[in-house]
Amino acid sequence: MLKMGVVLFTVLVLFPLATLHLDAEQPVERYAENKQDINPDQRSGFLTFALRQGCCPPGVCQMAACNPPPCCP
């Protein structure tokens, strides 16, 4: 009975923990490899697009009682 408990613990607890650790590292490596292929002009394009979006929803900063934060256009 003790041997079966040790085998079950190993299979159900330790083995999944080891595989999850490997899976967690792979997306970061893939993401870094994908970004290395982009030239600097394209990288800055992503950033400027995000900055142009603004942080306020449309119509919020036009209200009379609104004190717009500095990010509102």
UniProtKB/Swiss-Prot annotation:
Subcellular location: Secreted
Tissue: Expressed by the venom duct.
Record-level Gene Ontology MF annotations: ion channel inhibitor activity; toxin activity
Disulfide bonds: C55-C66, C56-C71, C61-C72
Alphabetically ordered keywords of this record: Disulfide bond, Hydroxylation, Ion channel impairing toxin, Secreted, Signal, Toxin
UniProt modified residues of type 4-hydroxyproline: P57, P58, P68
GO CC terms in record: extracellular region
Family of the protein in this entry: Belongs to the conotoxin M superfamily.
Role noted for this protein: Conotoxin with small effects on sodium (Nav), potassium (Kv) and calcium (Cav) currents. At high concentration (10 uM), it has no effects on the peak sodium currents, but induces a ~10 mV shift in a polarizing direction in the current-voltage relationship. At the same concentration, it increases 19% of the peak potassium currents but does not induce a shift in the current-voltage relationship. At the same concentration, it inhibits 31% of the peak calcium currents but does not induce a shift in the current-voltage relationship.
Domain free text: The cysteine framework is III (CC-C-C-CC). Classified in the M-4 branch, since 4 residues stand between the fourth and the fifth cysteine residues.
Protein name per its UniProtKB record: Conotoxin Vr3a
UniProt lineage: Eukaryota, Metazoa, Spiralia, Lophotrochozoa, Mollusca
